[in-house]
A protein has these predicted regions:
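Ligand-binding pockets and gating/stacking loops
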Residues: 4, 14-474
């Protein structure tokens, strides 16, 4: 399988194969490398690959654990759980907020009245109402939710552990040849960092998400900005010609005696490089990114703004074999003007998620596609008095309770897991941590959550330390 990186709006195809530069037994030079190792190093350089990544990583070319995919809808900034999936209409006025609740299509499950479309699809969802990590720092919270571990803070923002998407890319690869494993739409981010805590950390840049459009990123749901074709896709044709030149290079090397490489690494490199050429020249991935091929009715179902646009694109990508897609839906850090702020956000989220679930169901894809909706934390249950200069109530950071949605994916849906108290302040049953959520995602994909990869120091680090898959939903 192979992976994509964007640099100055051009595509660089990163191919990861089981290839190790190591000291050979014959013909060593003064640096301890054999002719075989030198050949590998030169070969990688000629193809524009990062030998540092290839040394650090070993892509084992395994078949996918299963054919399931994940679409992560990332609500950057932290949405209010009380105005979405855990309303408390009987709480005191200063807690319950501007809206009431409403029934869903599952008796006993109620959502905010601002989510009428999703309310029709509660039977396809598992509503986790008891997730918490008790941290109100954007950076610490986002790192925890996306990696399953505490690590970064506002004073030390560097990513410490790989994201769930990068780990899936590393452990599973794409579901279909000729597609990237991990894509960010329009660009994966967390707390204004790209890819931020959705990156690969010590797994290496080969497992970062393919960032589709860094030129038009962090778009609000209500944005009427015309969504342009990503420059990275516009350059595919030019890149195709450059890759075709690399094919000629490969052909010129066909006479190399493969007996010098008993591991078969060069043959594998040829094969993966050819897959890259096929993708670029035949346009399979390019087609997957093109939502203009969809009907007007379907585009209306998702919503015509950026959030609906990229959620529909995410469906197209998993349909073609991408294993993990993250859709960025930002601007949830609403410290003031909670009513106005959420009226600008919730309808677009509601339409995009509901449209996705309906579309997946109609296409027979829902059982094999896990949809995750989450941000870095919830919001303070008690309304504040606004923020400096904006004396209109909002909600502040709250890591003590939040809601996460898991939908489809073959789960036992139509249920709520866990509960918060009458004011949505903290869990009172089945308390869950971020690593429990991530362990569930890995399990759905057929990946053992205790799978380990080496960190920068060469120590094996499991995907999750203490988290366990949520047995009630499996």
């Amino acid at each position: 399988s192979f992976y994509f990186l964007e640099c100055e709006f051009t595509v660089s195809v990163q191919l990861v194969v089981m290839l190790e530069l190591q000291h050979g037994q014959l013909g060593k030079n003064c640096s301890g490398f054999s002719r075989r190792s030198a050949l590998k190093a030169g070969f990688l350089g000629a193809l524009g690959l990062s030998s540092a990544d290839l040394i650090r990583l070993r892509a084992e070319g395994k078949a996918a654990r299963n054919n399931k995919s994940v679409i992560l809808i990332w609500l950057d900034g932290g949405p209010s759980h009380m105005e979405t999936y855990d309303p408390k209409p009987k709480a005191p006025k200063e807690y319950r907020g501007p809206w009431s609740d409403m029934a869903t299509n599952v008796p006993g499950i109620r959502f905010s009245e601002m989510l009428p479309l999703q309310a029709k699809h509660a039977d396809k969802m598992c509503v986790l109402r008891s997730v918490h990590h008790d941290n109100g720092d954007h950076f610490a919270a986002a790192h925890w939710m996306l990696t399953g571990r505490h690590g970064s803070t506002s004073k030390d923002k560097a990513q410490k552990y790989p994201s769930v998407g990068s780990c899936v890319s590393r452990a599973k690869g794409p579901n279909s040849k000729g597609m990237p494993a991990y894509v960010g739409l329009p660009a994966a981010e967390s707390v204004y960092l790209y890819p931020g805590y959705q990156g690969a950390a010590y797994l290496g840049s080969a497992f970062n998400p393919f960032q589709l459009n860094m030129k038009q990123k962090y778009l609000a749901g209500r944005s009427t900005t015309k969504i342009q074709k990503a420059p990275v896709l516009e350059n595919l044709q030019e890149q195709g010609a450059r890759v075709q030149g690399r094919v000629s290079l490969l052909e010129s090397l066909d006479q190399i005696n493969r007996d010098i490489d008993q591991s078969g690494s060069i043959e594998a490199l040829d094969r993966y490089q050819q897959e890259a050429v096929d993708m670029v020249l035949r346009g399979r991935a390019r087609t997957a990114f093109d939502i203009d091929r969809e009907s007007d009715a379907l585009r209306d179902l998702y919503g015509r703004g950026p959030w609906g646009h990229y959620t529909l694109m995410a469906r197209r990508l998993v349909e073609q074999g991408v294993s993990f897609v993250t859709v960025d839906m930002p601007h949830w850090d609403n410290h003031s003007k909670i009513k106005d702020a959420l009226e600008d956000r919730l309808p677009y989220l509601d339409r995009a998620v509901a449209g996705l679930l309906e579309d997946l169901k109609q296409r027979g894809m829902l059982e094999d596609t896990l949809v995750v909706v989450m941000g870095e934390f919830g919001r303070t249950p008690k309304l504040n008095s606004g923020q400096p200069g904006i004396p209109i109530p909002g909600r502040d950071h709250w890591g003590q309770a939040m809601s996460v949605i898991l939908a489809g994916g073959g789960l036992k849906t139509g249920q709520v897991i866990g509960a918060t108290n009458s004011k949505a302040e903290h869990p009172v049953s089945r308390a869950l941590k971020p690593d429990d959520v991530l362990a569930t995602i890995y399990t759905v994909l057929g990946i053992d959550p205790q799978t380990s990869f080496l960190d920068f120091a060469g120590r094996p680090v499991p995907l999750v330390d203490h988290g366990e898959a949520i047995k009630e939903v499996l």
